[in-house]
């Protein structure tokens, strides 16, 4: 553990951020799996799931959870499915 007061605060802040990012990544992974596994005969539902997953990926990019190329790759995979 750090001895400097500000560093002790950063350790706590980093842990909170790590847990929040982990939860958000899990939510995105679930949305992507649902979109990729959606039945092609229900086109309206599949489109809705893909749009939701793309939206979450964009939010992850905006928050700095994903890098540019990963977000682009995930969106490309979703759109082509």
Swiss-Prot record:
Pfam families: Ribosomal_S20p. InterPro entries: Ribosomal_bS20, Ribosomal_bS20_sf. GO terms for cellular component: cytosol; small ribosomal subunit. Keywords: Ribonucleoprotein, Ribosomal protein, RNA-binding, rRNA-binding. The keyword Thylakoid does not apply. It comes from Mycoplasma capricolum subsp. capricolum (strain California kid / ATCC 27343 / NCTC 10154). Binds directly to 16S ribosomal RNA. Belongs to the bacterial ribosomal protein bS20 family. This is Small ribosomal subunit protein bS20. GO terms for biological process: translation. One of its GO terms (molecular function) is structural constituent of ribosome.
């Amino acid at each position: 553990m750090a001895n400097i007061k500000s560093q002790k605060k950063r350790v706590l802040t980093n842990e909170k951020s790590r847990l929040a990012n982990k939860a958000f990544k899990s939510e995105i992974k679930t949305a992507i799996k649902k979109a990729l596994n959606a039945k092609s005969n229900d086109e309206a539902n599949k489109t809705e799931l893909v749009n939701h997953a793309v939206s979450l990926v964009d939010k992850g990019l905006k928050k700095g959870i994903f890098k540019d190329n990963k977000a682009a790759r995930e969106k490309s995979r979703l759109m082509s499915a």
